[in-house]
Amino acid sequence: MYKRQILKRVEADEGQYDDARDVFWVSGAAFCCRADVFRALGGFDDDFFAHMEEIDLCWRMQLAGYRVRVVPGSTVYHLGGGTLTTDSPTKVFYNHRNNLAMLYKCASPVQRAVVAIVRPVLDLMAALSYLAQGRGDNFRAVFRAWRDFLRWHGSLSCKRKEIRQQCRGTVAGKVYRGSVLLRYLLGRKTFGRMM
């Protein structure tokens, strides 16, 4: 089973996730998709690099009326961090930038309004945390991500319009509405107890 990790701690696999089920997204390291669906939705976003392109596609698939499923009986071997190391400022940049772009493209108007208020505060906190740790390159990467995201606004608006035109489905009930990190810090150490 794909390991669930939060704050570099991995939840023990005790068979709690052995059933196939619908999920919001699956890891690109273990991703299979019908070719006709992949082509119809334009595949992975060419503007994303190595981070969140699979989440973006899974979100778009569901908005277009398709399902995303996890099949735990599968076996996949994957070298994590093979493209970029965990502490790489480039990884921090792509994580922040691509996540902002994905949210802008795929989220509902209400979700986007919440993100517009909360996200700058959270990203500023993340940047300041990097600075306090002496990781100035990661601090700057967060602001570069915002700069690039804001420059993309025109092309992202076009992509958002295309996604909305294909919209026949919903992700209602599939997106967790709380903070996984906060629940973890409050003592709910397994994903089963967080949800």
Predicted regions and their residues:
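Active-site-adjacent helix/loop segment of glycosyltransferases
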Residues: 63-161, 165-173, 179
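A cytosolic small-molecule/anion-sensing beta-strand core signal
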Residues: 27, 59, 72
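Glycine-rich phosphate/pyrophosphate-binding loop
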Residues: 11-23, 32, 157-195
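Short active-site alpha-helical segment characteristic of glycosyltransferases
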Residues: 54-60, 76
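A cross-family signal for key residues in well-ordered alpha-helices
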Residues: 39, 59, 103
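Short, cationic motifs built from Arg/Lys/His that form the positively charged side of catalytic pockets
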Residues: 34-35, 60, 99
